[in-house]
Amino acid sequence: EKILATTASDMVAVAQSQIGQTGGQPYWSWYGFGSRVEWCAIFASWCADQCGYIDAGIVPKFAGCGVGVQWFQNRGQWLPGSATPEPGMLIFFQWYGSDSSIADHVGIVESVADGRVYTIEGNSGDQVRRNSYPVGYGEIKGYGVPVTD
């Protein structure tokens, strides 16, 4: 049974309801994996699905961060890492020194205040937890912008 939602902030509410979950099993098994995989993107997809956003084509179902980046970029629904995001956007990271060509990690923007971006991220230390970063932080690759109207 899905947690039905109607606005971008509802994806935030779904993510908030999952804070403290560890291991990612509900998310990667929902996706179709039989054993644990890196699940940050799967968690973002699961939250979107709870809102009906995957069926509606608002957010893709993706297990690899690069696929998500390309989906948003191809649709012109992308902000650079220097931008100030809004709640409900997906925040993509590329870690310093990474060998990944596109992105390493993804979370959901919970709020923005006083020059900081507050996030909820799956697979952060193998759990769903809150983090925060300065706006424009160098490891933020950019933001996927769900369009709900």
Protein language model annotation of sequence segments:
Residues 1-56:
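N-terminal capping segments
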Residues 3-6, 17, 72, 109, ...:
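Compositionally biased, intrinsically disordered low-complexity segments
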Residues 23, 31-32, 66, 73-76, ...:
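Solvent-exposed, flexible loop/coil residues
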Residues 54-126:
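...with weaker cross-activation on analogous glycine-rich loops/strands in unrelated enzymes
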Residues 114-149:
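Active-site signature of cysteine proteases
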